Amino acid sequence: MHQRKGFTIIELLVVIAIIAILTTMSALSYNSTRVKARDAQRVADVGKMMAALEAYYNKNNIYPASLTTGGNLADSSTVYMTVIPTNPSPKTDGGCPGTAGYDYFYTQDNSGSSYHLVFCLGRDSDPYKAGPNMATPKYVTSTSALPSGFN
């Protein structure tokens, strides 16, 4: 009797299925890791902006009227932040509406004694929640009550 060496179709299909499952699992894990990394960058960016805003306020007794991503935060004699960070790409993590999904959104209150800095996260990251979060001089919180001008 003549024996053939090799794999059967069933054995090949099982191996292909296992490879497909492992590939899918690694791709999902990779995407999840990337979202976490972008969220960590967002939280770090907001912390840096809050520190710069406080330094500005301590010297000028008012928060700046606006912040422009890519610009700087400075007064006539001091640079508090050389580059206002931009939201990491893709900017739509967290399913935030309008401008929040694109860049950080800053507004000063009418008196200049407070501000709102809205940023979005793609996933829950204790103590923050996925979606819109808002920083003020006193706290950072998850929110659905967004400041006016936020689309």
Regions found by a protein language model. Give the residues of each.
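Extracellular/periplasmic head regions of type IV pilus-like filament subunits
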Residues: E54-R123, N151
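Conserved hydrophobic/amphipathic alpha-helical signal-anchor segments
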Residues: T24, Y30-A74
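Short, solvent-exposed loop/turn elements at domain surfaces
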Residues: S125-K129
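N-terminal single-pass transmembrane signal-anchor helix
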Residues: H2-Y30
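Low-complexity, S/T/G/P-rich flexible repeat/linker segments used as non-globular hinges
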Residues: A130-N151
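Compositionally biased, low-complexity segments enriched in small residues
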Residues: M1-R4, L12, A44, A74, ...
